[in-house]
Amino acid sequence: MTILALGINHKTASVSLREKVAFVEDKRQRAFEQIRDQSLAESVVILSTCNRTELYFHQPKIPPQEEHPDNIAWREQCFNWFAEIHQLDKEELSEAYYFKQNLEAARHLMSVACGLDSLILGEPQILGQVKQAYQESEEFYHSQGSGVSTNLSRLFQKTFATAKRVRSETEIGSSAVSVAYAACGLARQIFDDFTKLRFLLVGAGETIELVARHLINHGAKNIMIANRTHIRAEMLAVKLDIPMQILSLSALQIGLNQADVVICSTGSPDILITKEMVEQAQKQRRFDPMLLIDIAVPRDIDEKAGELDSIYAYSVDDLQNIIQQNIAQRQQAAEQAKEIVIEEAKDFFVWLKQQQSTNLIKHYRQNAEEIRLDLLEKALSALQQGQDCEKVLNELSYKLTNQLLHIPTQALQAMAKNSNVKGLQSFSKALKLEE
């Protein structure tokens, strides 16, 4: 059995590559279907955010040893599929992608969910994104009449519990540090007084909600929201309890013409704000400074807009400097969190081994019971035919002993051949032998 984590993130790939491998709209559904049809995994969870795209495969038929030929072939098959679904050159992808298996994969997932692998150390939004990814996987497999495999499901439930423990036992989440906070911090570096600015927020998801809260906390009073669905933007305005002008995406130009600061975070696969739209807005605004912050992957704002005069344009990658300033205070807490992750990942694999041994014992007992019933049936038949009782019982006990010991004997021979000293010692101890 093998659990494989495969993907890229902000540490290994640029925004341009990350946006190419984002699972947007129907691509996620196609991925689930292709993985099922190609038997790549019994279950998979697809995590796709601004800063990472990762897939967590569970394949019980693949041996866990990374050097095993079947394991190597399977990894290559998964990589080839990943490149193909995104129509990427394998050489380009191979420079940025990574894979982790079993214990290492469990540690990685837990680290991701705890915010230890995030662009902003300890940011809390990623946990919600991991939960959403798991929920989408559950929905797909339930639609197929099954569910996420027991082992992969258990790993994610353990991950959620670990993240909760990290939040409660460390100070990693004590300060409001996130992508949204970094975007707000960038705006404060360029503009002094938020009370006099007009903000245009594009999108109405969790990240934009956090951006809006940070802006309001720093004095913003004039906020516009543009979103694909009017009702969702309206709900956000009610939630934030502040009057906001709500625009449709088709009316983005109206908002741009008025905005000093534009912050975008949607799931759109296409550019929403072009260079020409910004140029037109600047003419309306008499070329007053405008800040464009695009925290969406794929991009919402044409990167060429940053070439215009009086425009300050930043992408997710450009937030790195602000983020670095906030990392130092979380390093100590992160070290504590890493210890918790190591402990919990180890605990998960203890459970996994117990589960595997329980299943093994169950199957062995079932096999033994089948042997017993088969030999008993033959013995009873022999007795009914008038054969000597003692002879029948001797034959029954002899065959029963031989057949029941056949599998353990093979296992012992395999352990000796593979130099499995611990296994042999455990068996010897169970039999109360000296050596």
Swiss-Prot record:
<comment type="similarity">
    <text>Belongs to the glutamyl-tRNA reductase family.</text>
</comment>
<dbReference type="Pfam" id="PF05201">
    <property type="entry name" value="GlutR_N"/>
</dbReference>
<keyword id="KW-0521">NADP</keyword>
<feature type="binding site">
    <location>
        <position position="118"/>
    </location>
    <ligand>
        <name>substrate</name>
    </ligand>
</feature>
<keyword id="KW-0560">Oxidoreductase</keyword>
<dbReference type="InterPro" id="IPR036291">
    <property type="entry name" value="NAD(P)-bd_dom_sf"/>
</dbReference>
<dbReference type="InterPro" id="IPR000343">
    <property type="entry name" value="4pyrrol_synth_GluRdtase"/>
</dbReference>
<feature type="binding site">
    <location>
        <begin position="49"/>
        <end position="52"/>
    </location>
    <ligand>
        <name>substrate</name>
    </ligand>
</feature>
<dbReference type="Pfam" id="PF00745">
    <property type="entry name" value="GlutR_dimer"/>
</dbReference>
<dbReference type="InterPro" id="IPR015896">
    <property type="entry name" value="4pyrrol_synth_GluRdtase_dimer"/>
</dbReference>
<keyword id="KW-0627">Porphyrin biosynthesis</keyword>
<feature type="active site" description="Nucleophile">
    <location>
        <position position="50"/>
    </location>
</feature>
<comment type="pathway">
    <text>Porphyrin-containing compound metabolism; protoporphyrin-IX biosynthesis; 5-aminolevulinate from L-glutamyl-tRNA(Glu): step 1/2.</text>
</comment>
<dbReference type="InterPro" id="IPR015895">
    <property type="entry name" value="4pyrrol_synth_GluRdtase_N"/>
</dbReference>
<dbReference type="GO" id="GO:0050661">
    <property type="term" value="F:NADP binding"/>
</dbReference>
<dbReference type="GO" id="GO:0019353">
    <property type="term" value="P:protoporphyrinogen IX biosynthetic process from glutamate"/>
</dbReference>
<dbReference type="GO" id="GO:0008883">
    <property type="term" value="F:glutamyl-tRNA reductase activity"/>
</dbReference>
<dbReference type="Pfam" id="PF01488">
    <property type="entry name" value="Shikimate_DH"/>
</dbReference>
<feature type="binding site">
    <location>
        <begin position="123"/>
        <end position="125"/>
    </location>
    <ligand>
        <name>substrate</name>
    </ligand>
</feature>
<dbReference type="InterPro" id="IPR006151">
    <property type="entry name" value="Shikm_DH/Glu-tRNA_Rdtase"/>
</dbReference>
<feature type="binding site">
    <location>
        <begin position="203"/>
        <end position="208"/>
    </location>
    <ligand>
        <name>NADP(+)</name>
    </ligand>
</feature>
<dbReference type="InterPro" id="IPR018214">
    <property type="entry name" value="GluRdtase_CS"/>
</dbReference>
<dbReference type="InterPro" id="IPR036343">
    <property type="entry name" value="GluRdtase_N_sf"/>
</dbReference>
<comment type="function">
    <text>Catalyzes the NADPH-dependent reduction of glutamyl-tRNA(Glu) to glutamate 1-semialdehyde (GSA).</text>
</comment>
<protein>
    <recommendedName>
        <fullName>Glutamyl-tRNA reductase</fullName>
        <ecNumber>1.2.1.70</ecNumber>
    </recommendedName>
</protein>
<feature type="site" description="Important for activity">
    <location>
        <position position="108"/>
    </location>
</feature>
<comment type="subunit">
    <text>Homodimer.</text>
</comment>
<feature type="binding site">
    <location>
        <position position="129"/>
    </location>
    <ligand>
        <name>substrate</name>
    </ligand>
</feature>
<dbReference type="InterPro" id="IPR036453">
    <property type="entry name" value="GluRdtase_dimer_dom_sf"/>
</dbReference>
